[in-house]
Amino acid sequence: MQVQEKFTAETFPASPEKVTLEGKNKFLGFWLFLGGETVLFASLFATFLALRNSNAGDPPTTEMFDVTLVFIATMLLLTSSLTSVYAMYHMKNFSFGKMQLWLGITILLGAGFLGLEIYEFKHYTHEFGFTITSSALGSAFYTLVGTHGAHVAFGLMWISTLMIRNAKRGLNLYTAPKFYVASLYWHFIDVVWVFIFTVVYLMGMVG
C-alpha cells in the first residue's frame, strides 16, 4: 500500500498504524520512548516517597490538599482518555471529521485539567507558602506533579498540531500512525496521573 493512497471507509485498513514500515517503526520507537519516560517518572515517585515527610515548616498535606479540586481534575483527565479512545475508534472507521471532533474535546478536557493544576499551584503558594523551595517535600511535589503537567501541555500541543497540519490531508497511511501514537501518549500520561493521585494526594490526605 502507498502511504498517500486514497481510501474509503470500506478499504481503509483496520490497523493503519501497522500497515507500513514507517508506521511500524513509529510504533516501536514510541514504545522505547515510553520506556524512558517510565524510568523518569519512577525516579520522581521514588524521590517523592523518600521526602514526603520532610515538610520542614510547611503545613501538613492533610490541611493543604483540596480533595474536591483534585477529584474534578482527575475526572477531566480520565474523561479525556475516553474521548481519545472514541477518536481512535472513528479513525479506524475512516471518519476523519468525527475523529477531529473527539480529539478537540480531548484537548478541551486536557486544558481544563491543566488550568486546575495551575490554580492548585497558585493556591498552595499564596495560601500556605508551599513552594518548590520551601521544603524537601515542596521540591519533590512540584517536580513530580509539575513534570506531569509539562507532559500534559506537550500532549495538548502535539495533538493540536496534528489536527491543524492534517486538516486538509485527512486520513491516510502517513497521518494515521501519527494520530495513533499521540493517542497512546495521552493514555500514558493519564495512567501516570492515576499513580500521582494515589501516591501523592490520597496518601497525603490520610497523613
Curated annotation (Swiss-Prot):
GO terms for molecular function: cytochrome-c oxidase activity. GO terms for cellular component: plasma membrane. It is a multi-pass membrane protein. It is found in: Cell membrane. InterPro entries: Cyt_c/ubiquinol_Oxase_su3, Cyt_c_oxidase-like_su3, Cyt_c_oxidase_su3-like_sf, Cyt_c_oxidase_su3_a-hlx, Ubiquinol_oxase_su3_dom. The keyword Cytoplasm does not apply. Keywords: Cell membrane, Membrane, Translocase, Transmembrane, Transmembrane helix. Its main location: membrane. The chain crosses the membrane at residues 30-50, 67-87, 101-121, 144-164, 186-206. GO terms for biological process: aerobic electron transport chain; aerobic respiration. It is an enzyme of class 7 (translocase). Its EC number is 7.1.1.9. It catalyses: 4 Fe(II)-[cytochrome c] + O2 + 8 H(+)(in) = 4 Fe(III)-[cytochrome c] + 2 H2O + 4 H(+)(out). CDD domains: Ubiquinol_oxidase_III. Belongs to the cytochrome c oxidase subunit 3 family. This is Cytochrome c oxidase subunit 3. It comes from Bacillus subtilis (strain 168). The lineage of its organism: Bacteria, Bacillati, Bacillota, Bacilli, Bacillales.
